[in-house]
Curated annotation (Swiss-Prot):
EC number: 2.7.1.35
Key words of the record: ATP-binding, Kinase, Magnesium, Metal-binding, Nucleotide-binding, Transferase, Zinc
Binding-site positions, ATP: 125, 157, 162, 195, 222-225, 232
A Gene Ontology biological process term: pyridoxal 5'-phosphate salvage
Binding site for Mg(2+): 136, 162
Cofactor(s) for this UniProt protein: Mg(2+)
GO MF annotation list: ATP binding; hydroxymethylpyrimidine kinase activity; magnesium ion binding; pyridoxal kinase activity; zinc ion binding
Coiled coil spans: none
Protein name from the UniProt record: Pyridoxine/pyridoxal/pyridoxamine kinase
Source organism phylogeny: Bacteria, Pseudomonadati, Pseudomonadota, Betaproteobacteria, Burkholderiales
Record text on subunit structure and interactions: Homodimer.
Length: 283
């Protein structure tokens, strides 16, 4: 006798720890293409929501793809709720966005989640650009972050250039960087981690990261590795979130995440690889 297939509506949904909303590439190690393996290394289940789908990053001679259509993007988010997958979500992680309309849609969606779950962690890497390349996102993204997303974040990980764009304040010195970061600590925000903080002040061969809270500011320092694959910020953000969910205080989580990135960079340099090679087992 042929048994009837079980009704999927009657079965328990897949438990999801992290909703990671970032870019996706067919070839390379950026956005969710690097973040998901890092999350999995912590034993976390991830719902990976693409904002753009590209063949590779734009620094290659050819690239195909683009932003996910807005109706698809909103549908991805809505269907996570419809499948009952959001009940146990511990963190929503945001990276590269395809444009201001996505930011606005995300703001509405996250606000709805936070209204139901005030303790929900929202970690945002406000991807805008960097000192070397300038702005490399769609026009209007700085205003979109300010208008729709910053007030929902529990934690933010801008680089120094992005911090200056978001706040309109100087970030040339570490003192200025810390002061600018503190202006983002309103609403739900508890911490701001500034990567590549005040680069003009670094000792030779070193890189500094500022970890800023309402009550404290710590400056972490690590070695500069002479290679520059894309995706290090995405890897750092995922590792940071993994360590935070494992119970580490924010400064220690940042230290451990930076160490993982350094190990990956050293492995990448030794292999002579043009794409980021993830480091070995977590410590």
């Amino acid at each position: 006798m042929k048994l009837a297939a079980p009704n999927p509506q009657a079965l328990a949904p897949l438990p999801i720890d992290v909703v990671s909303i970032q870019s996706q590439v067919v070839y390379g190690q950026v956005g969710n293409s690097v973040a998901v393996p890092v999350f999995n290394g912590f034993g976390l289940r991830v719902a990976a929501v693409p904002t753009v789908v590209l063949s590779n990053t734009p620094h290659y001679p050819s690239m195909h793809g683009g932003a996910v259509p807005l109706d698809w993007f909103e549908g991805y988010l809505a269907d996570l709720g419809a499948r009952g997958a959001l009940a146990g979500v511990r963190v929503v992680q945001l990276g590269y966005l395809g444009g201001p309309a996505q930011a606005e849609a995300l703001g509405r969606w996250i606000a709805g989640l936070v209204a139901e779950r005030p303790d929900l962690r929202v970690h945002i890497d406000p991807v805008i650009g960097d000192h070397d390349s300038g702005v490399y996102v769609a026009p209007g993204m700085v205003a979109a972050y300010r208008d729709h997303l910053l007030s929902l974040a529990q934690g933010l990980t801008p680089n120094g250039f992005e911090l200056e764009c978001l706040t309109g304040l100087p970030t040339g010195t570490m003192e200025q960087t810390i002061a600018a970061a503190r202006t983002l600590l309103g609403g739900r925000a508890r911490w701001v981690i500034v990567t590549s903080a005040a680069p003009a002040t670094w000792p030779p061969g070193r890189v500094r990261v500022a970890v800023v809270t309402h009550d404290d500011a710590q400056v972490l320092e690590h070695a500069h590795v002479d290679t520059a694959p894309k995706g290090t910020g995405d890897m750092f953000g995922a590792a940071l979130t993994g360590h935070r969910l494992a119970g580490q205080p924010v400064a220690e989580a940042a230290r451990r995440a930076a160490l993982q990135v350094i190990e990956a960079l050293e492995r990448t340099r030794e292999a002579g690889c043009g794409e980021l090679l993830l480091a070995g087992p977590l410590r």
